[in-house]
UniProtKB/Swiss-Prot annotation:
Heme b b562 binds at residues 83, 182. Binds 2 heme b groups non-covalently. Heme b b566 binds at residues 97, 196. Its cofactor is heme b. The keyword Heme applies. It comes from the Eukaryota. GO terms for cellular component: mitochondrial inner membrane; respiratory chain complex III. GO terms for molecular function: metal ion binding; ubiquinol-cytochrome-c reductase activity. Keywords: Electron transport, Heme, Iron, Membrane, Metal-binding, Mitochondrion, Mitochondrion inner membrane, Respiratory chain, Transmembrane, Transmembrane helix, Transport, Ubiquinone. It is found in: Mitochondrion inner membrane. The cytochrome bc1 complex contains 11 subunits: 3 respiratory subunits (MT-CYB, CYC1 and UQCRFS1), 2 core proteins (UQCRC1 and UQCRC2) and 6 low-molecular weight proteins (UQCRH/QCR6, UQCRB/QCR7, UQCRQ/QCR8, UQCR10/QCR9, UQCR11/QCR10 and a cleavage product of UQCRFS1). This cytochrome bc1 complex then forms a dimer. This is Cytochrome b. The chain crosses the membrane at residues 33-53, 77-98, 113-133, 178-198, 226-246, 288-308, 320-340, 347-367.
Length: 379
C-alpha cells in the first residue's frame, strides 16, 4: 500500500514541500533564514494573539493596558517582550535573507523575488503599526511623523493623511484602525509566504555556486529538517537571551512615557530596523524628494534582477562584486547608525554621502563590477 503522506490530498502538499522535496546538496547556513522567518512569524502571531486578549485600543487605556499586561497578567511580561524583541529577530532574519538573495543571485527567480519584496513591505507596515499600539511618546510621534510624510504627495496629500488618521490628528480613530490592521496583516503575510514558497518550489532552490544542482539533489527530510531545527534552536536561544537579559536594549526609553500631543520628544526616531530608510529620508532637504527616496530605498530591490549584467549568477567566484556587496553592507550599517543620530554636523553630511553611495552602488557600481569581471574572464 502506498504511504498516506503520498496519497492524501493535504498530506501530499506538506510531503512535497517539506519531506520529499528535492534540495541541492550544497546549500549553506545562509539558506536557513527562510525557515527561521516562518518560525518568527508563527511566534509573532501566537504572542500577538495573547497580547490582543488583554490589550485595549483606546487612547485613554492603551498605555495602561500594556502596563497591566506586564504587571498583572501571568507571564504577560515575557509575552510582551518576546513579541517586541521577536520583531527585531524577524528583521535580522529578513535582512540576512535578502542579503543572501543578493549575494547568491537568488533574485533570478523573478516571481519568488517579487513576492519577497511585497512580503518585506507588508512586514515593515505591520511593524510600524505595531510600534504605535503601546501609545507611548515615540509611538505617538512616530505615527504622526511617518503618516505626515504622505502629505508630500501633490494634490491629494493632505486629504490622504486626514483619511488615514480618521480626523485632524493622530487620535483614537488612528489607534483603533492601526490595531485592526496590525492584527490582520500577519495573516496576509502568512498567505503571501505560502505564495512565496509555491513559486520557489516551481524552480527549486538556488545554491551557493549559482550552477544548476539538478544532477545532485537530496531529500529535504532528514537532511534539512535537522539543519532547520538547529537554526531554530539558535534563533530561540538568541531571542530568549535578549528577552530575559536585555529586553529594552533595542527599544526607546521615550516609549515608557505615555503619549502627549503637547510635548514633542527631542529626537523622534523609529525602531532600529527602520533607521537606514529613515536616514535616507532625512538626508534629502525636500519633503517629496525624501519620501520618494524612502520608497525607492526598498523598491530598488525590484530592479536588482534587471541590473544583473554578469554571466555568472552567484557572487561566489566574483571578487570585485563581492567587494561591492560588502561595501553596500557597510553603507547600510552606516545609514542605520546615522538614522539614530540627531540632525546636526557631521551627521547630516555623512548621511547624505551614505545615501548617495547606497543608490550608486546598486544602480551603477555593482552592474559595472559585473561587466568588468565578464571582460576579465574574456566572456
Amino acid at each position: 500500500m502506498t504511504n498516506i503522506r503520498k496519497t492524501h490530498p493535504l498530506m501530499k502538499i506538506i510531503n512535497n514541500a517539506f519531506i520529499d522535496l528535492p534540495a541541492p546538496s550544497n546549500i549553506s547556513s545562509w539558506w536557513n533564514f527562510g525557515s527561521l522567518l516562518g518560525i518568527c512569524l508563527i511566534l509573532q502571531i501566537l504572542t500577538g494573539l495573547f497580547l490582543a486578549m488583554h490589550y485595549t485600543s483606546d487612547t485613554t487605556t492603551a498605555f495602561s493596558s500594556v502596563t497591566h499586561i506586564c504587571r498583572d497578567v501571568n507571564y504577560g511580561w515575557i509575552i510582551r517582550y518576546m513579541h517586541a524583541n521577536g520583531a527585531s529577530m524577524f528583521f535580522i532574519c529578513l535582512f540576512l535573507h535578502v542579503g543572501r538573495g543578493l549575494y547568491y543571485g537568488s533574485y533570478a527567480f523573478l516571481e519568488t523575488w517579487n513576492v519577497g519584496v511585497i512580503l518585506l513591505f507588508a512586514t515593515m507596515a505591520t511593524a510600524f503599526m505595531g510600534y504605535v499600539l503601546p501609545w507611548g511618546q515615540m509611538s505617538f510621534w512616530g505615527a504622526t511623523v511617518i503618516t505626515n510624510l504622505l502629505s508630500a504627495i501633490p494634490y491629494i496629500g493632505t486629504d490622504l493623511v486626514e483619511w488615514i488618521w480618521g480626523g485632524f490628528s493622530v487620535d483614537k480613530a488612528t489607534l483603533t484602525r492601526f490595531f485592526a490592521f496590525h492584527f490582520i496583516l500577519p495573516f496576509i503575510i502568512a498567505a503571501l509566504a505560502m505564495v512565496h514558497l509555491l513559486f520557489l518550489h516551481e524552480t527549486g532552490s538556488n545554491n551557493p555556486t549559482g550552477i544548476s544542482s539538478d544532477a545532485d539533489k537530496i531529500p529535504f527530510h532528514p537532511y534539512y529538517t535537522i539543519k532547520d531545527i538547529l537554526g531554530a534552536l539558535l534563533l530561540i536561544l538568541a531571542l530568549m537571551l535578549l528577552v530575559l537579559f536585555a529586553p529594552d536594549l533595542l527599544g526607546d526609553p521615550d516609549n515608557y512615557t505615555p503619549a502627549n500631543p503637547l510635548n514633542t520628544p527631542p529626537h523622534i526616531k523609529p525602531e532600529w530596523y527602520f533607521l537606514f530608510a529613515y536616514a535616507i529620508l532625512r538626508s534629502i532637504p525636500n519633503k517629496l524628494g525624501g519620501v520618494l527616496a524612502l520608497a525607492l530605498s526598498i523598491l530598488i530591490l525590484v530592479l536588482v534582477p534587471l541590473l544583473h549584467t554578469s554571466k555568472q549568477r552567484s557572487m561566489m567566484f566574483r571578487p570585485i562584486s563581492q567587494c561591492m556587496f560588502w561595501i553596500l553592507v557597510a553603507d547600510l550599517l552606516t545609514l542605520t547608525w546615522i538614522g539614530g543620530q540627531p540632525v546636526e554636523h557631521p551627521y547630516i553630511i555623512i548621511g547624505q554621502l551614505a545615501s548617495i553611495m547606497y543608490f550608486l552602488l546598486i544602480l551603477v557600481l555593482m552592474p559595472m563590477a559585473s561587466t568588468i569581471e565578464n571582460n576579465l574572464l574574456k566572456w
